[in-house]
A protein has these predicted regions:
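Core domains of carbohydrate- and sulfate-ester-processing enzymes
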Residues: 62-110, 201, 220-232, 373-385, ...
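Single conserved hydrophobic/aromatic residue that forms the stacking wall/gate
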Residues: 2-9, 13, 604-609
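C-terminal beta-strand-rich structural cap/linker in extracellular carbohydrate-active enzymes
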Residues: 567-601
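Conserved alpha/beta catalytic core and glycan-binding cleft of carbohydrate-active enzymes
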Residues: 271-273, 288-457, 462, 483-554
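Conserved, mostly hydrophobic/aromatic
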Residues: 60, 122, 159, 198, ...
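Substrate-binding/active-site clefts of carbohydrate-active enzymes
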Residues: 81, 101-114, 123-304
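C-terminal accessory region downstream of the catalytic core in glycan-modifying enzymes
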Residues: 463, 470-472, 478-480, 538-570
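Aromatic-rich carbohydrate-binding modules that target alpha-glucans
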Residues: 11-55, 63-82
Length: 611
């Protein structure tokens, strides 16, 4: 076999690196045995070495202008040693035989914006473990995680970063290998196998990707030749002091080419279906987490990072050019406009989706309130619809919300044991009916009371308790209802898909609204955020006919109180909230219910007689 060791760098390399050699198993780590040749004024070094076996370890030995020699991991390595070791490994990335042609055909025929997107966010090392504490491999995850996700009705798996990283405590968000799948769980083709298996089961795969910053580990990208190569030299624009990381120099062509190549690599070689770009806000603002005097304004005196904006626009343009069916998702927490505008214009960034952090913060605050006080905060419940269609939003309840003392989802709920379960069911049923794609971090679906611990597996033993099994069943059923009913997902991004029925019943903390499919079929959603039952509650309906309850978060099989609206619900010619007809229903405590039109009357006269 042949090792082609090449490093494409900027002019800094040409000016600063005095020499580069390849060292490894094959030459007993001799710094002077295999020097690379500079083959262009652009700072490209190249070397061919014959007879290097696959999985052999190697590094670059880079000589700085001060004649210091530093061992560096190959920035373009496809495979690396498992931490704490950090050498690159020779690996043949091509040759995996894919079986996902039908999946790609399906994606081309079914644009994701009008399809159900319900993401199960996973940390690969702590979803489930062996009894001895060892983590599952990519292939073991394929055997265990994929059937679970399919049975639960989720449409996609999103992994926290699988790009190689040295520090477990970063959860993968401090990356040293932008082309290397972490070896914690196996080799690259094992991850390809996982993605392939997902596609065969109709499940998409999204990867977290971190182009915002990188760690200062000595073997990584930082100070690659002793100076700032991938990062800015000036710490006012080149470092995140709070995170202890470097910031990529987006104004340097070679750096943006490196990052663009990384994103395309995961789409091309690993067939992933989407990329969630982490920490976008930190890229957009030069004063992000900085005090006065700690940052440098742009050429116009502003705080916008114009070269980072240009990079993100290029990223989304290139991805959509070659992978129009791919999902590009921004974790962006500010009010930066047009994050999901595409084609790009007017400072639009070109993402497909943006995490709705405003909705997430408002709703987690609201559901944490004692119900006694919720009527004083009704605007928190309804405010999201003021801006719901300003971007293509995804509603996230992510890993960030169940760590660092924030409490698990079920422990955010006030009240006693039963009330906490009712609170989770009601909140999730409301979330599934709210416009926007969905994301839920692992563990909430089993009612885990403890916060997520990256060092431990989820508390699967909870499923030996009836309440937790019933909650797990609820998640599966509400996920499948969302997936199978077009009104719940087809039209998430304009008012044609959502209409308020009543948003003003603040005294009872009840809201009701319609979700409408392209063909006009619809679901009526009624949400009660008080532990109070209401009989003969009037809800406006759009048509004169017979309605039925098709989902109830308080159903007995889900562990609820079992109060339901059984049988036929006949609409009356009684106007309610701008709708010409209405029906009377029973509203259970803390319940969310879905209704649909079962049939229109044979004759209006016949129904009038029944009234």
């Amino acid at each position: 076999s042949t090792l082609l060791a090449s490093s494409a760098a900027s002019d800094v390399y040409k000016r600063q690196a005095l020499s580069v050699s390849v060292v490894g198993d094959f030459n007993d780590w001799n710094n002077d045995a295999n020097f690379m040749y500079k083959i262009s004024d652009g700072g490209v070094w190249e070397l061919f070495i014959e007879g290097i076996p696959e999985f052999a370890c190697y590094k670059y030995c880079v000589e700085t202008p001060w004649h210091e020699r530093r061992l560096k991991t190959d920035p373009y390595a496809f495979h690396c040693q498992t931490r704490p070791d950090n050498a690159s490994r020779v690996y043949e990335i091509d040759g995996y035989e894919w079986h996902d042609e039908k999946w790609y055909d399906y994606k081309k025929e079914h644009p994701h914006k009008s399809m159900p997107v319900n993401v199960y966010e996973v940390n690969a090392g702590s979803w489930r473990k062996y009894e001895d504490g060892n983590v599952f491999s990519y292939r073991k995850l394929a055997d265990e995680l994929i059937p679970y996700v399919k049975n639960m009705g989720y449409t996609h798996i999103e992994f926290m970063p699988l790009t190689e990283y040295p520090f477990d405590g970063s959860w993968g968000y401090q990356v040293t290998g932008y082309f290397a799948a972490t070896s914690r769980y196996g080799e690259p083709k094992d991850l390809m196998y996982f993605v392939d298996r997902c596609h065969e089961e109709g499940i998409g795969v999204i990867l977290d990707w971190v182009p915002a910053h990188f760690p200062k580990d000595a073997h990584g990208l930082g100070r690659f030749d002793g100076t700032g190569c991938y990062e800015y030299e000036d710490p006012r624009i080149g470092e995140h002091k709070e995170w202890g990381t470097y910031i990529f120099n987006y104004g340097r062509y070679e750096v943006t080419s490196f990052l663009l190549s990384s994103a395309m690599f995961w789409l091309d070689k690993y067939h992933v279906d989407g990329i969630r770009v982490d920490a976008v806000a930190s890229m957009l603002y030069l004063d992000y987490n900085r005090n006065d005097g700690e940052w440098i304004a742009n050429a116009y005196g502003g705080r916008e990072n114009l070269v980072a904006v240009d990079f993100l626009q290029k990223l989304n343009t290139v991805v959509h050019m070659f992978h129009p069916e791919a999902m590009m998702i921004a974790e962006e927490s500010t009010a930066w406009p047009n994050v999901t505008r595409y084609p790009i214009k007017d400072m639009g960034l070109g993402f497909d989706y943006k995490w709705n952090m405003g909705w997430m913060n408002d709703m987690l605050s609201y559901i944490s309130l004692d119900p006694l006080w919720r009527n004083y905060h009704h605007d928190t419940l309804t405010f999201s619809m003021v801006y719901a269609f300003s971007e293509n939003f995804m509603l996230p309840i992510s890993h960030d919300e169940v760590v660092y003392g924030k409490g698990s989802l079920i422990n955010k709920m006030p009240g006693d044991y039963d009330m906490k379960f009712s609170g989770v069911r009601g909140f999730i049923a409301y979330m599934m009916a709210h416009p926007g794609k969905k994301l839920m971090f692992m563990g909430s679906e089993i009612g885990q009371f403890d916060e997520w611990n990256a060092n431990e597996e989820l508390e699967w033993n909870l499923l030996s308790f009836e309440k937790h099994r019933q909650l797990n069943l609820f998640f599966a059923e509400v996920n499948k209802f969302y997936r199978d009913v077009p009104a719940m997902h087809e039209n998430d991004y304009d008012w044609d898909g959502f209409q308020w029925i009543a948003l003003d019943d603040y005294k009872n903390s009840i809201i009701s609204f319609r979700r409408i499919a392209y063909d006009g079929s619809e679901i009526i959603c009624v949400c009660n955020f008080q532990p109070v039952q209401h009989d003969n509650y009037v809800v406006g309906v759009p048509e004169y006919g017979i309605y039925e309850e098709v989902f109830n978060s308080e159903a007995e099989e889900f562990g609820g109180c079992g109060i339901r609206n059984e049988g036929e619900l006949k609409a009356k010619k009684k106007k309610d909230h701008e709708l010409n007809y209405s029906m009377e229903i029973t509203v259970p405590p803390l319940a969310v219910m879905y209704f649909k039109l079962k049939k229109k009357p044979v004759s209006y006269t016949h129904l009038d007689a029944a009234d």
